[in-house]
Curated annotation (Swiss-Prot):
Outcome of gene disruption: Overall loss in complex colony architecture and lack of fruiting body-like structures. Disruption of the gene results in the loss of surface repellency and alters the biofilm surface microstructure.
Cellular component aspect of the GO annotation: extracellular region
Lineage, highest ranks first: Bacteria, Bacillati, Bacillota, Bacilli, Bacillales
Gene: bslA
Native source species: Bacillus subtilis (strain 168)
Protein name: Biofilm-surface layer protein A
Factors inducing expression: Up-regulated by DegU and Spo0A. Repressed by AbrB.
Family that this chain belongs to: Belongs to the BslA/BslB family.
Subunit structure: Forms polymers.
Annotated signal sequence range: 1-28
Amino acid sequence: MKRKLLSSLAISALSLGLLVSAPTASFAAESTSTKAHTESTMRTQSTASLFATITGASKTEWSFSDIELTYRPNTLLSLGVMEFTLPSGFTANTKDTLNGNALRTTQILNNGKTVRVPLALDLLGAGEFKLKLNNKTLPAAGTYTFRAENKSLSIGNKFYAEASIDVAKRSTPPTQPCGCN
């Protein structure tokens, strides 16, 4: 019985190794037809990417707007935790969405600074995660950097990515609530 279990585990491990190494070898070929064309024809292990965009009407400080973060781990195989880290001035809540579904309180950590997806699967770089921060007050003018990371059992190159947004300065300062200067 023990021998049968060990042999089936060995076969499973070998199969997984072949599954992972076969696409890597077949896609990693370099193009050498001309000197001008020196880039790879296909890349299996491209780095992770994150795109951050202010999708609302205003991009100026102290106004309300939506922010959309699109993360692609671009791994061959990954299973585990996906995590977004928000910069100072931004927080997530249950009115925000991940891939069109409202965030649950269990996905929001560190007082809204971290959004964690507990079980995420990316196979052959097909995974895409869209975090939409809805109706946020944009902080003071400046550049803000967001980070997304695949913290899991992964096979690939680079598992995190960063992207920045620029919040513009208001043309006129906001009025004081008391009407005083």
